[in-house]
Amino acid sequence: VDTGRLPAPEQVLELIRARRSNRALTPRPIPDEALQRIVEAARYAPTASNSRQVSFTLVTEPEQLLRIADFTVGVFASTARKLLHPVVRTLLKPLRPDLYRYASRFAEIEREHEAGNDPILRRATALLIIHTPASNRVGCEDANLAYQNASLMAESLGVSQIYMGFVLTAARMGRKNAFARIAGITGRPQAIMALGIPAFRYLKYTER
């Protein structure tokens, strides 16, 4: 370890504070070298028992990105129609109000998607899918440790990164292995990062 090249604590904290989920993305592609550095940073994250059962898949083909967005919207649209059916809503909402937190938003997402907007990927030009074997009991924890490494590396490279919670939720709600086939992965997706060149850089910190 070359300790002389390690950043000062103040520099590390500066990077952490500067990292924000900038959803204003441009269509410019991310250089391959930057993408590889992001993946490399993710690979160096620790894993439980040093099992290293974490895999990383980059998706950069526009058609495949669109299929992932279509899949996500389709899962949510189907769910929204079921939840918002008058009979179902009357019976279920008093018992499970938590299910209705995003029901209206799901329908809105479908309308935005059909209008040609991109409410899911935000016009990201790449997705980093972090996945683990289904048998890995701590796969989620391992994957999200790797995600944070990748996120900070992306920030240092001037690449915006957005946690794809909607895509991850749809992958879990959809038919078994449907997302895995579309995304070209094995195992279970545990964390998904959208990546893109930002239209601008934030000049102020956000208070936490």
Model regions and ranges:
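Acidic, surface-exposed loops and disordered segments
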Residues: 1-208
